[in-house]
Amino acid sequence: MTIIVASLFLPYTPQFEADVTNSDTAKLVESSMIKVDCNNQELSNNKQERSSSVTSASSHYIGLPQEAQINGEPLQRANVGSPATGVNYHNEMEMLSSEQFLEELTANATHAANSGIPPANNPVSSGSTAQRPSVEEFFSAPSARVCSPSQEASASSISASRSSAHHNDLSSSLMKNPNLSFDSHPPRVRSSSKSAVITPVSKSVPDVDPAVVDVAKVREEFQQQASLPSMKRVSGSTAGDSSIASSSSNLRYSQQFQDNFIEDTDSEDDIDSDLETDATKKYNVPKFGGYSNNAKLRASLMRNSYELFKHLPWTIVDSDKGNGSLKNAVNIAVAEKTVKEPVSWVGTMGIPTDELPHEVCHKISKKLEQDFSSFPVVTDDITFKGAYKNYAKQILWPTLHYQIPDNPNSKAFEDHSWDYYQKVNQKFSDRIVSVYKPGDTIWIHDYHLMLVPQMVREKLPKAKIGFFLHVSFPSSEVFRCLANRERILEGIIGANFVGFQTKEYKRHFLQTCNRLLAADVSNDEVKYHCNIVSVMYAPIGIDYYHLTSQLRNGSVLEWRQLIKERWRNKKLIVCRDQFDRIRGLQKKMLAYERFLIENPEYIEKVVLIQICIGKSSDPEYERQIMVVVDRINSLSSNISISQPVVFLHQDLDFAQYLALNCEADVFLVDALREGMNLTCHEFIVSSFEKNAPLLLSEFTGSSSVLKEGAILINPWDINHVAQSIKRSLEMSPEEKRRRWKKLFKSVIEHDSDNWITKCFEYINNAWESNQETSTVFNLAPEKFCADYKASKKHLFIFKISEPPTSRMLSLLSELSSNNIVYVLSSFTKNTFESLYNGVLNIGLIAENGAYVRVNGSWYNIVEELDWMKEVAKIFDEKVERLPGSYYKIADSMIRFHTENADDQDRVPTVIGEAITHINTLFDDRDIHAYVHKDIVFVQQTGLALAAAEFLMKFYNSGVSPTDNSRISLSRTSSSMSVGNNKKHFQNQVDFVCVSGSTSPIIEPLFKLVKQEVEKNNLKFGYTILYGSSRSTYAKEHINGVNELFTILHDLTAA
């Protein structure tokens, strides 16, 4: 048996390497048909080291070549390639225009102004000498002369790089060379100085209006244009020609973006992926032709591209994309034998595949399958980007985080991107089905693959399937804004088990299924179309032991010393967030500003270090934040000595990040909405010495796990956050220690190992429960008659919803003459008696178990009726909103009918709202609303089961019930157990038959009979289902009620 883990990206990816001195390669680079990554061993090592963090986020760095910075030499265009050919090799951001440079320069002006703090962007120098510049300057005091533990730099070089002259010349030097070419994507592994890691370039999604254009046809045309190879975007100026540059601009934010999307750092790192470039941006095509328009040349380049990737050496390396927390948890569980079964992965390779020859793709796939147990899902680039970048990132992700897309064109955009999303999900489903073997467990992850569970279920109805959503799940009011909401929900509940990070997300999902699908839900189950889906929550965590070993690393210890020197006698508030609106960056800065204004004595004593990772696609939001940052820093009397805010729009090396956590006096998370923020867990483990307080937004999933020790804050309450900052800085050591112990205990209890164990336990239990309810055999009439004759005391309970026919009345009369026979229905007592008044000895169970007639007398099973007036008021409102609908009030239940409603399209919405309202309002009173055969029933729960237990107790004990009372029964004890008295055993019921079509009313009776047989309290038990059902506790099946009465006729005639 194998565990099949399906995630968007595989944990491994192919890496190609090319000789940069080759002339054919040079032509392809100039044509922008491939992407070249320059060598940077240090950053690749950093990615490997960050395996224990939530994501393995790499960064974009923009700055100066280190030699030019240190020696003060004139800046020249950075050339990578053969000196003989003089070819320039460019990365994704091939050129920086003056406009873009001013944007980057201004973005880093906040900390560049400090003589001890360089710009937060990293240069990539020419050739193989690329290094991350001046990182130690950021962490070191101006007077310090300590080398970075992660770089081999001479003392003189470091000293020179810290000189004030260098910083004075920095801006002027860059201003003189605004079109400098910078590389931004270092490779994972260092190659020789004459080689480079290259990646094929993906096509962009067609920008069409689906209302007037056949999207499928346009996409097909895009894919078939072999003479028009995919091109890299050019930013600012044309590639390869320094004489052509875009005009300068004094405006820092001049570029406008139509669509803003929010990055998902909790789930994946998509910074270094060509597949994930913004599909809404247009190519910057040079005027008057610019690039060659020669079709033969393009075709030749395309052939060269295929030939290049056909012969290039490649290897499989660890991927830095995807859900880092998932990969870490699975790998650790496998290594520690928590998971004993072999694990296979299903996902995409993480690189564009359209430019790769088919045979190369096939070889890579075989290598991944055979050596890495990874099964690639290969789809064309346009479909992948349409599904991931357009639908998942710009529709699903914002909506799941309460940021509903409100662009006027979003509806059309959503419609055509939904088509891509379905296609990618179908690809995943097909791949999983091809890999699956009986007995395997399928575990599907996150919002990219919400349709996969149901797609797999259609092909593999008996498979064991789990689904886990790593991000938040919103309330039904928000989720219902999605156009394809029902399809998504039905896709998710194709799984046996659905998991969430918190109890709140689980509750939202249950309410949404109840409201939008009119599904019957309980505290931890969804019942829909005869399927029962387990819904639980299990917060993910980190591996404490692995992180602790990294904290003892020599580099971390040295960085800690540098940080202490750099900010001696300062209080450090550390923050690390993805750069997007839901992280609450602006509100955080406003709260910090309020704190400093109200407590000016802290201006020279506190430094807030804000680390932002990920791309910024929202210039206006960045401008708003930087305005506040500049305002805060202006509070300082001397910004070169005391800078209240250090704003870094880049990630740090993992060793630096851990060191900063260790030295932090406060860790602040002010997100407006977020899933499980594992940076909090990393901080808690890192702060084992200082026991620093954690300020945590109550709107994060982490707050449900860490609420005992964290200081919970409302990011919308600026004043409260400001007060909480002061409280945390002034907290006594005793309170710090007490709070930290609680936080640390939560981290240990909710670690990655516990998460894996819980999830598989839930998946297995849910599957086993479904197996019990899905094994139904056709009733064998001969055995049924034989067991009937072999027993002495018989109890029959028939659930009959329709008025009886004369044949049914005749057979029931004959059967009840020698047996105990009861009919169960939703009819009222008066209606029931009028229908069955011709059958003298028959017993009746009215209103689904609320009342039982024994020997001509009625007995109450129902206990509570005072809720009915409140429910009637709710239905009054629904009847007004839905003309033609009506409701009926019985003695113990209310039924809401919509079959005559004028607007049938609104019926599901109104029913869903009514059910959600009632079940939420009466959740603690055992009053439940459910839909059966398009009628909404509202009644006390468990009445039919209580009635059955009442009858078994009565007929087994021989005790006459007291009028208008209920025989007391314990639900945990057997309702049929009567002790060891042999004589008394002879008088108890030894044959029970319960029959009817599946419904929430009769299923508990099926389960009861099954349990009594298993406990040997009942000799013969038959649970007979008629009609169709895929999930039931019944063990025998017949075609319909007519077949049932035919068998009863044979039984009585025998």
Swiss-Prot record:
It holds the Pfam family Glyco_transf_20. GO terms for biological process: trehalose biosynthetic process. Gene3D superfamilies: Glycogen Phosphorylase B. It is found in: Cytoplasm. Residues 287-778 are annotated as: Glycosyltransferase. Induction: Repressed by glucose. InterPro entries: Glyco_trans_20 (IPR001830), HAD-like_sf (IPR036412), Trehalose_PPase (IPR003337). GO terms for cellular component: alpha,alpha-trehalose-phosphate synthase complex (UDP-forming); cytoplasm. The trehalose synthase complex is composed of the two catalytic subunits TPS1 and TPS2 and at least one of the two regulatory subunits TPS3 or TSL1. In the N-terminal section; belongs to the glycosyltransferase 20 family. This is Trehalose synthase complex regulatory subunit TPS3.
